[in-house]
């Protein structure tokens, strides 16, 4: 006899009340990824330029990074976040725009760190583009 299928109920997202957090900004040449975590590294909110509807070369613009930062910051502030430290990684165009957008939303930025990985002469970089 076949077993009866149970209804699966989806749990609602539980709002975590976190006052201090870390904003990780990963800015590449093609996209900007913003993740807001608590001090242990558990993700509270995230947003990317591509996730917001920017496609192609528009993903890498400072405006797209600004919109991503605002979106992630609003969700984090709904969870009670007030002060953040900022870790910036990568060479992209959206670095400064994302930090300014975070400050404009009302989050208090206590520290800004550049954690871009620098090779000790590791892999060969891609060749220069000739356009």
Swiss-Prot record:
Stored Gene3D superfamilies: Ribosomal protein S11
InterPro entries, sorted: Ribosomal_uS11, Ribosomal_uS11_bac-type, Ribosomal_uS11_CS, Ribosomal_uS11_sf
Disulfide bonds: none
GO cellular component terms, A-Z: ribonucleoprotein complex; ribosome
Gene Ontology molecular functions: rRNA binding; structural constituent of ribosome
SUPFAM superfamilies per UniProt: Translational machinery components
Annotated coiled-coil segments of the chain: none
Keyword flag RNA-binding: yes
Record key words, sorted: Ribonucleoprotein, Ribosomal protein, RNA-binding, rRNA-binding
Domain of life: Bacteria
Spans traversing the lipid bilayer: none
Matches recorded under Pfam families: Ribosomal_S11
GO biological process, any: translation
Subunit structure and binding partners: Part of the 30S ribosomal subunit. Interacts with proteins S7 and S18. Binds to IF-3.
Task performed by this protein: Located on the platform of the 30S subunit, it bridges several disparate RNA helices of the 16S rRNA. Forms part of the Shine-Dalgarno cleft in the 70S ribosome.
PANTHER family: 40S RIBOSOMAL PROTEIN S14/30S RIBOSOMAL PROTEIN S11 (PTHR11759)
Family: Belongs to the universal ribosomal protein uS11 family.
Protein name: Small ribosomal subunit protein uS11
The encoding gene: rpsK
